[in-house]
Amino acid sequence: MIAVIFEVLPADGKWEKYLDIASALKPELNKIDGFISVERFQSLTDPKKVLSLSFWENEQSVAQWRNLQQHRNAQKAGRGFVFDDYRLRVASVIRDYGMNNRTEAPADSKIIHY
């Protein structure tokens, strides 16, 4: 599983434009084979900063998304006039577990939190 962590700082007066672009792209995400989920968060320490966290089955699905023409157009707009700054991190998920599904939890955690 791949996590894409996209931090963005929209330019002054461009908050709504950023949200419009993100909303227009969301239906396209669901068309990508290998897309799992996406959520958007607003920073508590810097209310101007937004984080988009998406999960993908593999790097091929991320590449398909990255190269989708609508997404390339959004990237161009973002870099051109919507963003003051951004940072993108792409990471491999080592483990994925929760309160009830403990399959991938480390053995020492399973002993304590059974």
Short names for language-model regions:
Residues 1-50, 59-67, 83-114:
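Short S/T/G/P-rich N-terminal loop/turn motif that feeds into the first structured element of a domain
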Residues 74:
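Conserved short loop/helix modules at catalytic or binding sites
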Residues 79-80:
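Short secondary-structure boundary/capping segments
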